[in-house]
Amino acid sequence: MSLSTIFAAMALSATAVATDTVNLPTATVTAPAKTKVELLPLDVTMINSETIERSAETSLLPIMVSNVPGLFVTERGFMGYGVSGGSAGAVNIRGVGQGNKVLFLIDGQPQWAGVFGHSLPDTYVTNGVERVEVVKGPSSLLYGSNAMGGSVNIITRRQTRDGVFGSARAMFGSFSTQKFAVSTGVKKGKFSATVAGQVDRSNGNREGSEFWLANEFMQVQYDASDNWQTGVNVDMSQTHANNPGTTQSPLLSMWTRLQRGTASIYAKNRYDRFNGGVQAYINWGRNKVDDGYAPGATPRDYLFNSTDYNMGFTLYQTVNPWRDADISAGIDFVHWGGHNWNTDKIDPSKRSAEFKAHENEIAGYVMVQQGLWHDLLSINAGVRLQHSSQYGNEWVPQAGLVASPFKGSTMKFSFGKGFRAPNLRELYLYAPANPDLKPEYMYNYEVELRQRFLEGRLNVGIALFFIDGKDMIQTRMIDGRPKNMNTGKFINKGFEVDATYIINKEWSVSANYSYLHTDTPLLAAPKNKLNAKVDYAPGDFRFTLENSTIWSLYTNLDPVVKSDYTLLDLRAAYTLHNRVPVTLMVKADNILDRHYEIVYGCPMPGITLMGGVEFKF
């Protein structure tokens, strides 16, 4: 019997993790939030600040992979995901995600590149983050396009206690890796502010895979009264990523330079019978790419440049007109687009292949929830109408119910539609472009059962899903020429199991498993995914042993190449409770020294070590 099988059986039989990752059956306050999580009959997982801090990671994506069943992210090396050709960081939920079908948000503000429509994986860092809410299944009712397969809402940290608090962390490790982070928060009366910064750099596990990232975050909040709150958020990132290509097709001098920024201003209200708010936001980027060249070939004489943006506002309100009832309604507007061009390497003033375009979208939605028999049963239904300057109208229905027939039990049944609008590249850029494309869409059917035992110390859940996708945008040969068409379709189905068990004050265990069946082979969508974790916290020490096992992961489709692997990671920390608490930490990943690939031709590192220190004040 393999080590992974023994470890999985141990974790599942004892059942599983801990308090720090929770599948929410109840409300979570999001700031700003369009609605309560409890109003959604979907499968929602929250990753809180304790989980994020204990991971010792600076990117949110690997934390999500470990803690969310059914979610998978591609990686091409030790650090950094990149953009352009050969990039990684594709996020799939239940096999849906390629082509930006999972929407990332920061405090409810959508994040994506305006021209190519892709997400921005290197910018999703732990710096300044309080928690992450992951919705598995369509979130298009609330967020519209790009939330077809699900949504990831990154909630930033807010100072809640009067005084000045902060932390500083430094870590060093394999491949000359250095990670530094500092944050501080202040609150005095009605005013609060948080400022944080992060710098990561590494030489990478392959020659030519160097990576550098800097992130700056600022949040200011003012409680104008007991019922009104206003705030401003600003988040900036700069990345330099080198890409050596694949082992089959190596590249020289391939690099990307990104400057990304996002800012928002909001006002929220909260009264006894209604709450809501308004938020205006802008997300922008400046990108420069050298696509590199093969050894022995002639270097390219130009650089690719682009600027992009998406900006808009959202207005939302929830009212409680009578007992156990909630009615939520809102309006969203977004203006997005960008500008691409090539510049000569010798004379940057020479431009070629220029492209510029934009689109506008406006939407309104309403959602109603009614609790019956003292909330033994809650019925939920909603609809969204989205209008685009390109594709016209798109209706998005969603319905479901939540039942609590026994103490500690929850049953969810849901139906929902998700969609993704074509991006500017698919519509207007390059040879296959087709300005007449319509949105991709899918219908999701889901049942979730959850039961708590032993006064909540044991939490077990299972979810079953069926996904029917239509009008996928694919490139077809029409009259001898490539053309993007709404021709693809897919069926995904499967189930997920997760369990958490707090044994006592020192011991806790957890596991989650997902099974995915697809009617066609898909990259970055493993058929079987298992994560299991054991936590031991005696006194001021803390030890975590974590297993990740993947079976039947397609890394290439022609020729067909599959990857199976088991990873074992170890984390240890010791806290000195002085006037200023100091935590010494070490983490060792892939301690079995497995050789594996997630992206074809991009070998992942063997054993890696990181050590560091954190101060809190």
Predicted regions and their residues:
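N-terminal periplasmic "start-of-domain" segments of outer-membrane beta-barrel proteins
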Residues: 25-58, 85, 217
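Flexible loop and strand-edge segments within Gram-negative outer membrane beta-barrel domains
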Residues: 202-209, 213, 227-310
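C-terminal beta-signal and adjacent terminal beta-strands/loops
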Residues: 468-470, 552-554, 572-617
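Short acidic/polar hinge/loop motifs at secondary-structure boundaries
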Residues: 92, 109-136
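Gram-negative outer-membrane beta-barrel transporters
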Residues: 372-373, 466-468, 485-555, 583, ...
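Extracytoplasmic beta-strand/coil segments of soluble accessory domains associated
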Residues: 62-109
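Outer-membrane beta-barrel signature, preferentially recognizing the C-terminal barrel domain
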Residues: 247-266, 270, 306, 357-359, ...
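A beta-strand signature from Gram-negative outer-membrane beta-barrel systems
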Residues: 123-167
